[in-house]
């Protein structure tokens, strides 16, 4: 069960695995407010995803580890699972959509995982992973709809709240909802006055549509340059957490994201991935 104690436990477990990324104050991007970036692109594996995947794997039983782990991913969760599994001597198989960037495919292999490329998008890779789990008996590590994974992502909020005493709001990119669920749950329990806002692409508005319709919606198709959040259906757990703790979700267009990518480079020399440039 998700709890604040679980998030703090994740922070303890992850201390020897991840980097604590310091917030970076920006100048010029948003002159009317104090804007800080949390550069998880500097995290090991290049993404926050390793927080959730590494904590989840740390919580597996000896029997679950012995079966080997299987995961599906648009690319970043894949690398986190591969790294954490290899560090623990666990066999890993990752299902990736064939649209995943070759750099992420090769990095996943480099961290020690076997890769299965699946025609289509993330959701097709998910279906293949479930099929192989049932057939081969692997332990499945979900990329976002898992309480241990969500707790791992929630450690980001612990770091942000520790770094910034007077923070008003946290803005988070949304795909399946694991990141924003962890951040919102943690932030609201520690500092309830902090607003948490999500941002999702107009070409993949699964969580946005679900929240506004009051029930989980599955998209027929997703089409966005932000491949890391191109998810047709949010998670059951993440939907409930977002509904309860997130203040609002906004949609942004492909053009807005393309323009926003340039701002962090210009003002902080940090390159934002399309998935995060939607903020």
Task: Give each language-model segment a name.
Residues 1-273, 277:
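PLP-dependent amino-acid enzyme catalytic core
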